[in-house]
C-alpha cells in the first residue's frame, strides 16, 4: 500500500521524506499523471503508475494491498505470498530502487503541470 511504498523509499534512500518530496514532483509523482515525464525521477513515477494500472487490470487494489517485505542494505525485497501482493510489492520495490538512482531536481517539485506536462 502507499504507506509501505513510502517506507520502501526510505529504505532505498535513508533520510528521505517521501510523502513531502515525491507527492508533487514532475508530471507523474503524486496523484494522477499525464504528459511527458520531466526527468528520470518522474519517469520512475510514470513506470510505477503504469505498474499500478496493470495491477488493477489483474483485479488487485495496489493502493490498499498489504504485503510483506524487508530492507537489507538499502534494498527493498518482497516476501509476498499471493499473486496480487507479489505484483504490487514488485511495483513498489522497483520504483523505490529507481528513485534511489535518479537525481532529485528541486526545480521539478510543484511544477505547473498544465504548461510543463
From Swiss-Prot:
What tissue specificity is annotated for this entry?
Expressed by the venom gland.
- A single GO molecular function, which one? calcium-dependent phospholipase A2 activity
Q: Which SMART domains match?
A: PA2c
Biological role: PLA2 catalyzes the calcium-dependent hydrolysis of the 2-acyl groups in 3-sn-phosphoglycerides.
Q: Which UniProt keywords apply?
A: Calcium, Disulfide bond, Hydrolase, Lipid degradation, Lipid metabolism, Metal-binding, Secreted, Toxin
The reactions it catalyses are:
a 1,2-diacyl-sn-glycero-3-phosphocholine + H2O = a 1-acyl-sn-glycero-3-phosphocholine + a fatty acid + H(+)
- EC no. given is 3.1.1.4
- Which BP terms from GO are recorded? arachidonate secretion; lipid catabolic process; phospholipid metabolic process
Residues the record lists as binding Ca(2+): 28, 30, 32, 49
Which protein, by its recorded name, is this? Basic phospholipase A2 pseudexin B chain
Q: Which GO terms describe its cellular component?
A: extracellular region
Residue numbers annotated as active site: 48, 92
User: What is this enzyme's class at the first EC digit?
Assistant: hydrolase
Specify one Pfam family. Phospholip_A2_1
Q: Which pairs are disulfide-linked?
A: 11-71, 27-117, 29-45, 44-98, 51-91, 60-84, 78-89
Q: Which family does it belong to?
A: Belongs to the phospholipase A2 family. Group I subfamily. D49 sub-subfamily.
Cofactor: how and how many bound: Binds 1 Ca(2+) ion.
Q: Which cofactor(s) are needed, names only?
A: Ca(2+)
List the residue ranges forming a coiled coil, or say none.
none
Gene3D superfamilies of this UniProt entry?
Phospholipase A2 domain (1.20.90.10)
Q: Where in the cell is it found?
A: Secreted
According to the entry, what is the taxonomic lineage of the organism?
Answer: Eukaryota, Metazoa, Chordata, Craniata, Vertebrata
Amino acid at each position: 500500500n502507499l504507506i509501505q511504498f513510502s517506507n520502501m523509499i526510505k529504505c532505498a534512500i535513508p533520510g528521505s521524506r517521501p510523502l513531502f518530496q515525491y507527492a508533487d514532483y514532475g508530471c507523474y509523482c503524486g496523484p494522477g499523471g499525464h504528459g511527458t515525464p520531466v526527468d528520470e525521477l518522474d519517469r520512475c513515477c510514470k513506470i510505477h503508475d503504469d505498474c499500478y494500472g496493470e495491477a488493477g487490470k489483474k483485479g488487485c487494489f495496489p493502493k490498499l494491498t498489504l504485503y510483506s517485505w524487508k530492507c537489507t542494505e538499502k534494498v527493498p525485497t518482497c516476501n509476498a505470498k499471493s499473486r496480487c501482493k507479489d505484483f504490487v510489492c514488485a511495483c513498489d520495490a522497483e520504483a523505490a530502487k529507481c528513485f534511489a538512482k535518479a537525481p532529485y531536481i528541486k526545480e521539478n517539485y510543484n511544477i505547473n503541470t498544465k504548461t510543463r506536462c
